[in-house]
Amino acid sequence: MVKATSVKDVDQHEIVQHIAKFLKKSGKVKVPEWSDVTKMGISKELAPLNSDWYYVRTASIARRLYVRSPTGVDALRLVYGGSKRRGVVPNHFAKASGSVIRKALQTLEAIKWVQKHPDGNGRVLTKQGRKDLDRIASQMRQNDRFTA
């Protein structure tokens, strides 16, 4: 008997990598032109080193909406924020870039995985998005079962 697998049943780091691969391979997600020169937030000094960072961030946001929904841009800025280095003065928390998160959410809306919440309280995952994420998780679980 095959047990149903959801995104919550698999390792979060692995599922994000698999979702990112799926988004890149599907060709539906278009990386913005400015992605090679942008920082991920005010707390970062350099642009991301991973060339597929946009797919990974979009996949991470999709997983986050699966687990905790509805979620808005400001809440996601807190999740992806970090410590800002200020030299000899103690560090402070700084939010992540709202533009990057907003564009990633708009990308997920374009492929019909995410929609705006009817009450205006952020965004929620659609049935199609939930179904696709569960399918990716079950394929991941099956591949792990065959390789182990």
Swiss-Prot record:
InterPro entries: Ribosomal_eS19 (IPR001266), Ribosomal_eS19_CS (IPR018277), WH-like_DNA-bd_sf (IPR036388), WH_DNA-bd_sf (IPR036390)
UniProt keyword annotation of Methyltransferase present: no
Pfam families referenced in this protein's UniProt entry, alphabetically: Ribosomal_S19e (PF01090)
The entry's keywords: Ribonucleoprotein, Ribosomal protein
A GO MF label: structural constituent of ribosome
PROSITE patterns: RIBOSOMAL_S19E
Gene Ontology biological process terms, A to Z: ribosomal small subunit assembly; translation
Family from the record: Belongs to the eukaryotic ribosomal protein eS19 family.
Protein name per the record: Small ribosomal subunit protein eS19G
Organism field: Ascaris suum
Lineage of producing organism: Eukaryota, Metazoa, Ecdysozoa, Nematoda, Chromadorea
